[in-house]
UniProtKB/Swiss-Prot annotation:
It comes from Mycoplasma pneumoniae (strain ATCC 29342 / M129 / Subtype 1). Residues 1-115, 215-236 are annotated as: Disordered. Belongs to the adhesin P1 family. Residues 26-41, 98-113 have a biased composition (Low complexity). InterPro entries: P1_N. Residues 1-10 have a biased composition (Basic and acidic residues). The lineage of its organism: Bacteria, Bacillati, Mycoplasmatota, Mycoplasmoidales, Mycoplasmoidaceae. This is Uncharacterized protein MPN_462.
Amino acid sequence: MFGLKVKDATVDSSKQSTESLKGEESSSSSTTSSTSTTQRGGSSGDTKVKALQVAVKKKSDSEDNGQIELETNNLANAPIKRGSNNNQQVQLKADDFGTSPSSSESGQSGTPTPWTPWLATEQIHKDLPKWSASILILYDAPYARNRTAIDRVDHLDPKVMTANYPPSWRTPKWNHHGLWDWKARDVLVQTTGFFNPRRHPDWFDQGQAVAENTQTGFDTDDTDNKKQGFRKQGEQSPAPIALPFEAYFANIGNLTWFGQALLVFGICLS
């Protein structure tokens, strides 16, 4: 109802172009980046556009402090595959983000500098007024002086909202673009900040395997914390899925009209 909706792309034969994209790779040594070029052309019967091939490849530690360079990857596939033949999912490690200069300045590889998120749950708890919000509603009041009354509908308390986070949500997985994860671009496009994660459990680490919340399905590893994120202590039935607190700030400003409700962020109304 609110926000943008993205429809699946369909081919319109009446508007079909005779152009197509074709990726063309050139292999090179480990010290130079591989490149991809595009060529225009194709016949009028072409109905498919090929995605460009983009790649990353990590240099050896003795070359340029082990920085990364391009190697074949197809951005149209999700999750992104590393390499063209092994079909393995990308597992980011600390050294994938480069290294800091060596303290001895000897030219050797320095200490790995892993990327860290800019916002963690603990930071939200430290400054509640900054992250709290109140949902107000304005309605017609004929006997009021200005014919308008304001009432508080709900209050967003980040400490309460994050109390039931699964373990992997304790440190939100923001990538270097400032998005929630690799699918967060869909969240930002299709919502104003309020959405039901039960419709898209795959956005949240398979945090809810069944939309009706009959299973927790938290599929990370076999540790004791596997399914504790959706259960209360000592209870057998799963607790309702927690809406990520950051979702409320995904695509809305500090003062936003939402139907007849007015959302005011950064203040606490008791």
